[in-house]
Amino acid sequence: MLVRFGAVQYDSLRNLRLGPHRATLLLSQGLAAVQKPNHWMNTTHADYLAIKKFDSLDGLRAISILAVIWHHTAPDWVGATLAHAGAQGVSLFFSISGFLITTLLLREKARHSRIDLKAFYVRRSLRIFPLYYGVLLLYVALVTLLERDSVTGQAFYNNLIYFTTYTSNLFVPLDGRVIFYFAWSVAAEEQFYLIWPTVLILVGSLKRAALALIVVLLVCTWGEVQGNEFFSAVPLPIITGALLALLLHSEKGFNLLQPLLGRRWSSTVIGLGLTLAVLVPGVPNYVKALFFAAWVGACTIQVNHSARAWLVARPMAYIGTISYGMYMLHMLCKNVMVKTLGAIGQAAGGLEVFVLTVLLSTVVARLSFRYFESWFLELKTGFTR
């Protein structure tokens, strides 16, 4: 006869034959599981693999875009350290992408015994290309109208080939004011999407894929220590995010990380540690990259983690849903707000620029998502496996 106590299931007659002490021990474990609140239960590997939507990730995306907007709008009086910390929002984006894309690819392979590269690239293209090229065309029109003869405008035209081919992160230096420079992060992600699925197919196993990422991480870390700009330009959070996905997909890797990342308070503790790593000067990029991946892991392994309530709150979830549009449009929104404040005689030196940019970016991104992006997103369903 099978008896279940909470998460413990066993054959009661068989266990009774093992002796009263063994049966009593198992019975006490079952009762403890019954008495233990659900939000304290540890997630098993099977539970993790059964999760279809990591709902906390939208909240993390919201933090990412709000941090980026803060970086571009923070008033001078907050200081360079606090203002520049917002740039790490891109690193969080990277870690989320590395983790989520790798997880989706691994689960597709587990279900269908193969990864459909064509379907993957079509889905990614429908998500990224329409808005990216739409905003790029808008920038071309605005530069032609407003800055065609300026040095900055001419530089924009010269860089168009790199913006169009998603190589701006490699060939467009940040030297003064560079129009559309923020697209470097989208370029880095597109390069990851282009290379990583093929690598996963070629290496053939989780262990070899993980070893390959560890080698890349070590080489890039060595390059950073040596001061090599090429290696410093590699987005390490994408690598650590992908490595996290590989480890969690494996039962051994999951069991290794679960005691550290799967506790209810892991997300809060690691989030505080990440905040310190970002704010304290001199922390190496690879350390921050590991923290970003650990935070993503802590917010996905344990479904009812301590930070979940505010990460899945409706405003955070919604901002996370439209975060790509906010990222692509926030610099235009910032410029509109700065010029509007100037036109009414209001100096743009306080927090109002950040607040107004967030509000306008949210409205514009919502309109873009509803009336433009969603049309292309519906086409993705034909390529979903």
Set out the residue ranges of the language-model regions.
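Membrane-interfacial loop-to-helix junctions in multi-pass inner-membrane proteins
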Residues: 51-57, 85, 112-133, 150-157, ...
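Membrane-interface helix-loop-helix regions
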Residues: 40-42, 129-188, 221-222, 290-301
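Extreme N-terminal basic, low-complexity initiation segments
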Residues: 2-9
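Intrinsic-disorder-associated, low-complexity terminal segments enriched in Asp/Asn/His/Tyr and depleted
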Residues: 11, 15, 21, 38-39
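Hydrophobic alpha-helical segments with transmembrane-like composition
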Residues: 168-224, 229-235, 368
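Short alpha-helical catalytic segment bearing the HExxH-like zincin motif
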Residues: 58, 120, 182-187, 327
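Alpha-helical transmembrane segments in multi-pass integral membrane proteins
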Residues: 38-56, 63-87, 102-118, 141-145, ...
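Residues within membrane-spanning alpha-helices of integral membrane proteins
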Residues: 58, 62-65, 97, 130-133, ...
